[in-house]
Amino acid sequence: MIVRLFWLAVLWLALANANPLKRLNHVWSQRGVAKDDFLVTSLPGLSENIASDDVPLMFAGQLELYPENNTHYFFWKFSDQKKEPEAANRTIFWLNGGPGCSSMDGALMEAGPLRIGKDYKVQLNEGSWHRKGDVVFVDQPAGTGFSYSRDYDVELYQIEYHFLQFLKKYFELFPEDAHNDIVLAGESYAGQYIPYIAHGILERNKKLADGESPYHLKGLAIGNGWISPNEQSLSFVPFAVQAGLVSQKDPGWKAILQQHMKCQDLVAASHEDDTFGANSVVDKECEKVLNTILYELVDHSASQYEQCINMYDYTLRDSFPSCGMNWPPDLSNVNHFLKSDEVMSSLNLVQQISWTECSEHVGKQMKARHSKPAITLFADLLAEVEILLFHGNRDIICNYMGAESMIKKLHWGGQTGFSADSPVLKWFHGDEEAGYVKSERNLTFVNVFDASHMVPFDKPEVSSALVDILFKRFTVADDKLQTQAKKTNANQNDSPSASENDNESGRTSESASSSPSESAATETESHATRIVRLIQLAVIIILIWGLCAIYSTYRSKPTSIIKTKPSGRKKNVQWADLMPQEEPAPKGFLSKTLNKLSRTEHKYVPVDIELGPTDGMDDASSDSGPSNVGTAETPEFVIASDDEENAHEHTEEH
C-alpha cells in the first residue's frame, strides 16, 4: 500500500508540473513575445516569382498592447537584404486612413515590396519603399484589418496614445531598431493620424522617464492627405472646373454651386466663432459638395460600369453610385490572398480574423468630435521636423488644389505660406518629368503627375524617390530638381497592377527571407519543441499506466479502501486531477471615401470618402465626452472598399 501511495504521489507531481495541457496553455500565452514568433518565411509564390536576393526579410503578427482589453495591433515589417548605407538605420511606419482602413492596402498595392497577381501569388514591386529603409505597415486603430480589441477609439488623441504604446512594444521586440531614424508615412485620413502621432512622439521626448531613450523622428510623408477639412472641402468645385469635369453650362451647375455656397458659409462662420475649424474633422454639409458633383455628372447613357467619375482618379470611370469604390483593380486579388488560411498562418496570426479592407465599426466609433483637425498641429511640428506633402494630380477627394490653398493660409516659421520668391522646381526622376516641387522652412509640397489618390500604386518607382526628396537626396540646377532613377538591366514600367506583370525570377527556397542566424534559431527552437513533446507523450503514457494500475487494484480488493465513520457513510474523496478546475475567463461623404465601409453598388448613398463616419452612423459614443472609448459590438470586421469610404456616403482612402 505504501509503495502504491508513493507512486501515486509521483504521478500527481508529474501531472501538476508536466501537464501537457498546462504546458500548451503556457506556450500559447507566451506566443508573440519573442522576435522569432513573428518571422515570415513562406508565402504563395515567394520562391516561385522572386529571386532569392530580392526576397525581403519579413516579420508579421499581432502585437499585444493591452492584455486587460485584449488589444493587439497587427504589423508587417519588410527589410531589404541589400540595404544601401543611407537606408541602414531608418524605419518607415506606414498607415492607411479610413478611419478603419487596413494598411495592407499600402503593403500589397502601394509602398510594399509585394504585389498580388491574378493567381493570388506574390510578385515583386520594383518601386518598393523598403529599399529606402525598413517599412512597417500597421493596422490601426484596433478593429482595423487584422488588429483587434474589445474597445474602439473615438478621438484622435486616443490614436496618438495607443500608437505610442505600439511603438514601445515594437521596440521591445526589435531593440536593434530603437535608435533608428523614424519616418511616419501614409495617405488620406492618415493626414489626421500622422500629425497627432508625431505630436505625441515629440512630447514624449521632452519628458522621458528614467531609462527611456528618445525616438528619433526625422520626418513625415503624407500622400493626398485629409489634413484641413475647410480648405479641402472648398476645393472640390474649383478642381472640377479646372479639370474640365464641370462648367457653368452644365444642367447640374446650379445644384453644385448651391451646395458649395452652403459649405462656404459654414467655413466663413467657423473663422468667426472657431466652431467648425477647431472642432470638426468632417462636416456633413461640406461632404455633400463632392456628392453633388458626382451625382450631377452621372452619364446614364454610358454602360453600367462607366456611368460615374472615379473620385480617386478622374480619368477613370466606375459604376454609379460606387464612383471609385471598385478601384483599384488589385483589391480583389488582395482580398482573396489575405483571407487564405495559408497566408494567415504564415503571417503568424494568433487570432485569425477574416480580413476586410475597411471596418464599418471603427468608422462609426471614430467620430473625432472633440479633436481639432491635424492642420492645427502643423506650425509646432514644422519647428522640429521635416514634413513632405505629396499629391497625385488626378485625385478629386484629396486634391492638390486644396493642399496648396491650405499652405497659403498656414502660418509657420515666422510667416504665412511659401515666400513669394520661393521657386517652383520641375521634378525629374531619371529622364521622366514626374511633377513639381516647392520647399521652404521644413515644408515640402510635391505635385505628382499622372497619379491618383494612391500615388505609389500608379507610380511605384517615382513614389519611392519621395523619400529621397524628404531627406534632401537630390540635385538642383536651372530650376530643375533631379532624383536618381533605380539602375536596372531591364526596362521597368511603373505599372499600377501586379496582375499585369509576370516576374520570371529564379526559384529560391521558401525560407530565403531569413538570415542564417534566424534560421538556426528557428531550427533550435523546433528541436527543443520536439523534445518537449516527447517528454509530454512519455508523461501521458506513465499517467495512463498508473491510473490503470490503481483502478485494477481497486477492482481486485474485496472491501473498500476507504474507512467509514460510525454513521456508515463513506468520506467524499476525489482524485486531485478529477476535482473541478476553475475555468479561465475566455481569454458624409468623406466618411464613405475615407472609410469605404460597405461596397454598395446599386443604391445611391452620400459619398463617404474614407475620411470619417457617415450620416447614418450611431452617435451614441460621443455623448459621454472625449474620454469615452467605443465598445466592440461584433467579433467580425467588415470590409468597406479599397479607398476607405463608408458605404453610407461615398468617397476615399488607402
From Swiss-Prot:
Glycans are attached at residues 69, 89, 442, 503. The active site is at 188, 395, 453. One of its GO terms (biological process) is proteolysis. Residues 484-500, 622-631 have a biased composition (Polar residues). Residues 484-526, 606-654 are annotated as: Disordered. Keywords: Apoptosis, Carboxypeptidase, Glycoprotein, Golgi apparatus, Hydrolase, Membrane, Protease, Signal, Transmembrane, Transmembrane helix. GO terms for molecular function: serine-type carboxypeptidase activity. The chain crosses the membrane at residues 534-554. Its EC number is 3.4.16.6. Residues 508-523 have a biased composition (Low complexity). Residues 19-533 are lumenal. It is found in: Golgi apparatus, trans-Golgi network membrane. It is an enzyme of class 3 (hydrolase). Residues 555-654 are cytoplasmic. One of its GO terms (cellular component) is membrane. It comes from the Eukaryota. Pfam families: Peptidase_S10. InterPro entries: AB_hydrolase_fold, Peptidase_S10, Ser_caboxypep_his_AS, Ser_caboxypep_ser_AS. It catalyses: Preferential release of a C-terminal arginine or lysine residue. It is a single-pass type I membrane protein. Residues 1-18 form the signal peptide. Protease with a carboxypeptidase B-like function involved in the C-terminal processing of the lysine and arginine residues from protein precursors. Promotes cell fusion and is involved in the programmed cell death. Belongs to the peptidase S10 family. This is Pheromone-processing carboxypeptidase KEX1.
